[in-house]
């Protein structure tokens, strides 16, 4: 199972780094920061499906 450590999030600003992650909501997040901010917003219900685009 792929996991991402989001303990340092949320962050107010994310870099434009392009390292896509696919969330359990079938959305592609451009990088870990954007994904982790979404995880925090979802109260932990969003999980990582896999690395790369959905």
Curated annotation (Swiss-Prot):
One of its GO terms (molecular function) is serine-type endopeptidase inhibitor activity. CDD domains: KAZAL_FS (cd00104). Keywords: Disulfide bond, Glycoprotein, Protease inhibitor, Repeat, Secreted, Serine protease inhibitor. It comes from Vultur gryphus (Andean condor). Glycans are attached at residue 43. Its main location: secreted. The keyword Repeat applies. This is Ovomucoid. It comes from the Eukaryota. It is found in: Secreted. GO terms for cellular component: extracellular region. Gene3D superfamilies: 3.30.60.30. InterPro entries: Bifunctional_prot_inhibitor, Kazal_dom, Kazal_dom_sf.
């Amino acid at each position: 199972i792929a996991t991402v450590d989001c303990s340092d999030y949320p962050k107010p600003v994310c870099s434009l780094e392009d390292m896509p992650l696919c969330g359990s909501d079938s959305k592609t997040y451009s990088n870990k920061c954007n994904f982790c901010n979404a995880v925090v917003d979802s109260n932990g219900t969003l999980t990582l499906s896999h690395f790369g685009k959905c």
